Amino acid sequence: MTSTRLPQNIGEACQQANNLGVNAPELARFQDEPPQMASGDVGKSGYLRLGFARRGDRSILAQMKRRVPYLVQRALYWDEALPQMPCVFMISTSGCILQGDRLALDIHVAPEAFGHVTTQSATKIHSMENNYAAQVQTIQIEQGGYLEMMPDPVIPHSGSRFITDTQITIHPTATLIYSEIIMSGRKYHLADQGFKFDVYSSRITATDFDGKILFTERYVLEPKKQSLNSVGVMGPFHVFGNVILLTPQLHHDRILARMAPQYDAETGIASGTSRLPHQCGLIFKVLGKETYQVKAGIRLFWRIAREEILGVTLPEPFIWR
């Protein structure tokens, strides 16, 4: 087995995104092309490549390639606890994900480099009449590297179809904090409130540099076929948060000791932390009735992970985020 590698060029990355949903059983009903513009056409085949590297006492955004609708401006150093870490906002010039969109994101973290990647706002997946949207993400973190991938929530609108595949290759001395938040549509908009999307399909796979699979998490959500509000799925909750922490084993027990499981039906919050296979890391899941509850749960796990792994805490959040 060979290790997951970064695509060599924009064309290869975009082709991976174009191929992603073609043979997916959950998308078999949605292979029709949009009449306005073909899937993956100009403006609908986004690409972003970010490369973080160490330069002296700090890290920099050493490489950036892009194709619309993706956009990144200069890296900022806003984290006072980690002033050596470049922080990058991913921006979409389209403002949302539309039917027929094919998106590819590649991130490379060089040895001993740091990086933080987030989005400028929530990612909205608009309603669709034809086809679907697909996203491929490839993340590679070399020896001693550290990456925080902390995007804002995803909001799948009524009738949307989305498939995403994330391939992670990580050195055993490196650390990745990978977060995702999925909301139940536009909660306070009558036409879109609740789980009314058609398909949300996700796969995340991590391997080492020898190609050994560390773990795979796969889920296909089809609320029109099976209610997500049933017991054992979302129950009474409306927002789902998921954080994957890949880090050396010596940190695991200390983090687990500080992350007590929680369930409070009155306030509407539930969370817990588990070990991933092959001693590669931990996974934290949190359910809430409101987005701020899930964000607070993720922020707690993020802060504890930082303190135990790096010996630094998390600064107070910006008042505008």
From Swiss-Prot:
Keywords: Chaperone, Cytoplasm, Nickel insertion
Subcellular location: Cytoplasm
Main localization category: cytoplasm
GO cellular component, one term: cytoplasm
Keyword Chaperone applies: yes
GO MF terms, alphabetically ordered: nickel cation binding
S-S bonds: none
Coiled coil region boundaries: none
Quaternary structure, from the entry: UreD, UreF and UreG form a complex that acts as a GTP-hydrolysis-dependent molecular chaperone, activating the urease apoprotein by helping to assemble the nickel containing metallocenter of UreC. The UreE protein probably delivers the nickel.
Entry's family note: Belongs to the UreD family.
HAMAP family xref list: UreD
Function comment: Required for maturation of urease via the functional incorporation of the urease nickel metallocenter.
Name of the featured protein: Urease accessory protein UreD
GN (gene name): ureD
